[in-house]
Amino acid sequence: MALLNNQDEIVRPVANFSPSLWGDRFHSFSLDNQVADKYAQQIETLKEQTRSLLSDAACGTTLAEKLNLIDIVERLGLAYHFEKQIEDMLDQIYKADPNFEAHDLNTLSLQFRILRQHGYNISQKIFSRFQDANGKFKESLSNDIKGLLNLYEASHVRTHGEDILEEALAFSTAHLESAAPHLKSPLSKQVTHALEQSLHKSIPRVETRYFISIYEEEEFKNDVLLRFAKLDYNLLQMLHKQELSEVSRWWKDLDFVTTLPYARDRAVECYFWTMGVYAEPQYSQARVMLAKTIAMISIVDDTFDAYGIVKELEVYTDAIQRWDISQMDRLPEYMKVSFKALLDLYEDYEKELSKDGRSDVVQYAKERMKEIVRNYFVEAKWFIEGYMPPVSEYLSNALATSTYYLLTTTSYLGVKSATKEDFEWLAKNPKILEANVTLCRVVDDIATYEVEKGRGQIATGIECYMRDYGVSTQVAMDKFQEMAEIAWKDVNEGILRPTPVSTEILTRILNLARIIDVTYKHNQDGYTHPEKVLKPHIIALLVDSIEI
């Protein structure tokens, strides 16, 4: 934020955010209706063939064959077409095999992970048969690479106190790392990829794009599934490009790049974020709403963090609390731009949702916006006063400024099934939401520590922890990483049955956690600096189609 010098002149920092990587690339997109219709017709035929595959598997195949088919359909991004059919199959599997009698590591690991991901509270003890008297996994398993790979993936759905799964992670990781250089493709690629990014913590759409290319190399692939996946991917990508074009034009019309040059220009990255929350076609409205909100809160964040002075920010904060366009007259010229855009955006949401009689839920998102702005102002005052709070005080404020209370609430606006009761549940900050917010906060703090330190920020989470406990930077970062791992266990626990809300609602929270794991990979801030982390994903998901 800006400071006053000894002559009471405002000294504003020169914005050093890199420009958008994309320019006008996504501003216009013309849908080829002929190609889209052709794809859609083929997809309908392939969908029925896949439905038959699932029906046949449900009636007359082995447990391993059932699980493998479900796993492939999910990884290829096709499961949204067959949700009830897959749920019925899994319920059948769960009831038919209550003692988990599969004897091979591969099948049991696959069974455990898939059932856990669908909310079944399966005990970790089913893996004890693969351990010796000392609780160590038997070395005889070290040659079962597929089994180890599925054990590794299964270990990432662990919750608190699951020591067997902790041991499973360590054991499988060590042996997969040792084996990886000696494996043949496509298994070698799968192992290397998994060690870099576990399936459970990855963005589903990113994994779909990756797995289609891997599945194509498989010797015993199903050509119906492969073609279905490619066509479905490309058709859905057309919809995503249309939505991104809408968001990009909205962003360009606001002209923040010119009027607010201190702020990050990240509309494309904002849209990518929403694809992580929900990629399926029925969430089109939700994606556009969420992308615009992320872009808007980024502007507000940078206004507090990189430009405004305390007196300006105090008025700005108060104006947003009052949420009235008449407050604009109190603001300096540059703040009027974002203030009006903010109020206009939420008014648009109300108009849009009124068509379905749901405009009242926008108020929940407004309250979260007011909350985050209040907390941004607290951080601004800490900065100007040179105040370093105890880490507990820091976190109580910084959880809101992570943006995840706001973004989770906003993610439900365009979800037609989200009821007022769902928003009320979320407004009470349930444990799974608190975990998600904590995850976002501590991972962000690790990734942005050096940059914030360079900008003179002293009230960072890492600095506060170091001061409170008299420890080194590395020890503080290790502690924050430990907090992230605890948060992930809370998230995993929160999706297990019985649940207070629907799976559709909980999946948004899980997916928001996954976005953090991908965006901040290797402690990099992929949103602010998308060149290394997000650019390859954006090209794969929004530029390059799959060759049919």
From Swiss-Prot:
Amino-acid positions noted as binding Mg(2+) 1 in the UniProt annotation, renumbered to this chain: D301, D305
Cofactor(s) in the UniProt record: Mg(2+)
Localization, UniProt: Cytoplasm
Pfam families: Terpene_synth, Terpene_synth_C
GO BP: any one term: sesquiterpene biosynthetic process
Chief subcellular location: cytoplasm
Tissue note: Expressed in stem and leaf trichomes. Detected in roots, fruits and flowers.
Family matches, as InterPro entries: Isoprenoid_synthase_dom_sf, Terpene_cyclase-like_1_C, Terpene_cyclase_plant_C1, Terpene_synth_N, Terpene_synth_N_sf, Terpene_synthase-like, Terpene_synthase_metal-bd, Terpenoid_cyclase/PrenylTrfase
Binding site for Mg(2+) 2: D301, D305
Reactions mediated catalytically: (2E,6E)-farnesyl diphosphate = viridiflorene + diphosphate
Motif DDXXD motif: chain residues: 301-305
Pathway given in the UniProt record: Secondary metabolite biosynthesis; terpenoid biosynthesis
Enzyme Commission number: 4.2.3.88, 4.2.3.-
Gene Ontology CC terms, in alphabetical order: cytoplasm
Coiled coil: none
Claim: Metal-binding is one of the keywords in the record: yes
Any one GO molecular-function label of the UniProt entry: sesquiterpene synthase activity
Protein purpose: Sesquiterpene synthase involved in the production of viridiflorene from (E,E)-farnesyl diphosphate. Can also use (Z,Z)-FPP to make several unidentified sesquiterpenes.
Family the UniProt entry places it in: Belongs to the terpene synthase family. Tpsa subfamily.
Record remark: domains: The Asp-Asp-Xaa-Xaa-Asp/Glu (DDXXD/E) motif is important for the catalytic activity, presumably through binding to Mg(2+).
Stated name of the protein: Viridiflorene synthase
